[in-house]
């Protein structure tokens, strides 16, 4: 039964390729990067004086704290990738998973289409996974990451979302809504595994939900810390939820390398009104983006120091 479901994933992949062939994706990415760059440069030139004032709010402790919690979030992501390869029939150690995730994640900054995917699949196959299993594992990881980011964002922002829809945000209403969201999340996690041709046991579903929630907390704190520095007075839960939605839609935006621009725009929208200016919030999100890059490079360095050597030395 599992094998009969696997072609559905191939059909979905073919549909995406038909709608966004590699050349189209590359063109869209190039256009998007140019647009974002022009917007950022124009915005900075026009608002340089006030931007420099905001930058003074970010102490070394704020920057270091942002990098630290982001690295922890990325460690959790590598643990989650360990679960996904296990679902696809191959168990890796934490050191192996941390290295493969960090090395391939850094490649997302290289211009082009699918370097991140190609790097991960190559690393998996070098470690003994078949090409088919490696491709399925990476596809399932991306699906679960998008799903988990959107789910944790919706759960964190349930009260705000209900109020925006004109629905009561009473405790009972919020609780019932969150239960329904969790139920949908469980079903979609299970469905994702089945579409790759692999059965996903209840323990794997529960572990995925826990790990996705933990990574959402730490990655979201990477936004909350800079927001606190500019006196935005945003609660940690709102920052976590807003950034989770931004991450989810950023992952899904095939035209935006590393979700750049999309992640920030969605996060800004989801945060809503604050006690500071919109400009200060935008600068805080920009600081998060830069510190995320620093965290990516640092994670790569850490993973390189602990990665297993070919001769088996530790």
Language-model features: where?
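Residue-level signal for inorganic ion chemistry
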Residues: 84, 112, 134, 140, ...
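Transmembrane alpha-helical cores of Major Facilitator Superfamily
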Residues: 106, 140-143, 248, 290
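Predominantly cytoplasmic-facing regulatory/coupling regions of multi-pass membrane proteins
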Residues: 1-102, 149-253, 262, 273-314
């Amino acid at each position: 039964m599992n094998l009969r479901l696997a072609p559905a994933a191939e059909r979905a992949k073919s549909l995406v390729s038909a709608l966004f062939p590699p050349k189209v994706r590359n063109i869209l990415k190039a256009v998007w990067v140019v647009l974002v760059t022009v917007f950022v440069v124009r915005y900075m030139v026009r608002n340089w004086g006030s931007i420099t004032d905001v930058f003074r709010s970010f102490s070394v402790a704020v920057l270091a704290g942002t990098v630290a919690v982001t690295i922890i979030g990325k460690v959790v992501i590598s643990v989650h990738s360990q679960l996904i390869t296990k679902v696809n029939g191959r168990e890796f150690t934490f050191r192996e998973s941390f290295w493969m995730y960090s090395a391939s994640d850094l490649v997302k900054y290289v211009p082009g289409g699918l370097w991140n995917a190609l790097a991960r699949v190559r690393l998996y196959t070098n470690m003994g996974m078949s090409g088919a299993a490696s491709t399925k594992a990476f596809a399932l990881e991306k699906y679960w990451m998008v799903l988990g980011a959107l789910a944790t964002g919706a759960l964190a922002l349930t009260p705000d979302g209900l109020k925006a829809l004109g629905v009561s945000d009473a405790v009972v209403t919020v609780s019932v809504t969150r239960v329904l969201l969790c139920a949908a999340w469980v079903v979609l996690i299970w469905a994702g595994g089945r579409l790759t041709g692999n059965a996903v046991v209840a323990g794997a579903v529960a572990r995925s939900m826990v790990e996705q929630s933990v990574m959402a907390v730490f990655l979201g704190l990477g936004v909350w810390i800079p927001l606190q520095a500019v006196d935005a007075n945003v609660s940690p839960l709102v920052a976590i939820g807003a950034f989770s939605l931004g991450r989810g839609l950023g992952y899904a935006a095939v035209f935006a390398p590393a979700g750049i621009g999309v992640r920030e725009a969605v996060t800004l929208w989801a945060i809503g009104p604050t006690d500071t200016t919109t400009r200060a919030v935008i600068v805080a999100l920009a600081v998060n983006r830069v510190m995320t890059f620093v965290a990516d490079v640092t994670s790569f360095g850490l993973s390189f120091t602990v990665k297993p050597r070919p001769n088996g030395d530790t």
